[in-house]
């Protein structure tokens, strides 16, 4: 009986330690952001000194963080929608259609996952600066310049292809017998069955686009078009910005990703678990 109590107590001590390790840094960010006075390293886990919203007000009004957040939201919204749409169509073709060279196409798409952004930075810059013949303008210094390069993400295509490949062909054949065309099969048969994978792809895609730093740095040189990761990198070396204000901006930058993850957590977890079971 005594050993069981010690076992329970030890287990709860481990849980408490893990809670401090994982929640402690986030609480340190919150405490610093809401503190009106400078926070010392030893006080990161304490309650905020002089609880105040001045850091957020200064960041929102004086620095204009709202505009950088709006830029990021626009880029991530349209980027995620286009990315998921293109990935779903590409995955449907690779998983459900048999054509010559399908293995080669899949290999080429997957090989792009092995290339870091730094390798293609110069090529991407040159492509973005090409002047389009119809409009006599380039994608440089535009939202499209930040959106289009993230549309074709090999990871999204790979995940959706694996899920679509596992769908029994009998369902597709039954839909064809009932008179369904290709688009009806795609929207009403295939997509509903891969909702968990879509949740996973949307979550990862959102976070990937939201955290983009190098891409906006390459294709944008106007401050009014900068995204929140770029402005965070700029303010990090600005001596006029106090650590409290910088942490407040960091907290604002974290909120959209947290909200999206919590909103899609059910589908995200199902997608991860389904992939684990299949593997």
Model-derived segments and spans:
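A structural signal for multi-pass alpha-helical bundles of membrane permease subunits
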Residues: 2-279
């Amino acid at each position: 009986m005594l050993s069981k109590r010690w076992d329970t107590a030890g287990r709860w001590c481990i849980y408490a330690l893990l809670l401090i390790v994982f929640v402690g840094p986030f609480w340190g960010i919150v405490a610093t952001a809401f503190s009106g006075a400078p926070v010392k390293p030893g006080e990161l886990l304490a309650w905020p000194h002089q609880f105040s919203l001045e850091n957020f007000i200064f960041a929102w009004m004086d620095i204009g963080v709202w505009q950088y957040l709006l830029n990021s939201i626009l880029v991530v919204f349209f980027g995620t929608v286009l990315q998921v749409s293109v990935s779903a169509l590409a995955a449907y073709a690779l998983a459900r259609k048999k054509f010559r060279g399908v293995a080669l196409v899949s290999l080429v798409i997957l090989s792009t996952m092995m290339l870091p952004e730094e390798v293609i930075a110069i090529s991407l810059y040159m492509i973005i600066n090409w002047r389009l013949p119809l409009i006599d303008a380039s994608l440089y210094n535009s939202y499209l310049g930040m959106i289009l390069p993230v549309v074709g993400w090999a990871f999204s295509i790979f995940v959706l292809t694996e899920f679509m490949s596992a769908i029994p062909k009998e369902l597709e054949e039954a839909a064809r017998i009932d008179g369904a065309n290709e688009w009806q099969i795609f929207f009403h048969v295939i997509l509903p069955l891969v909702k968990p994978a879509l949740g996973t792809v949307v979550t990862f895609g959102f976070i990937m686009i939201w955290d983009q730093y190098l891409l906006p740095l390459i294709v944008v040189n106007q401050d009014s078009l900068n995204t929140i990761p770029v402005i965070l990198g700029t303010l990090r070396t600005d001596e006029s910005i106090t650590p409290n204000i910088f942490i407040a901006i960091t907290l604002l930058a974290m909120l959209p990703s947290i909200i999206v993850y919590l909103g899609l957590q059910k589908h995200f977890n199902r997608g991860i678990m389904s992939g684990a079971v299949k593997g």
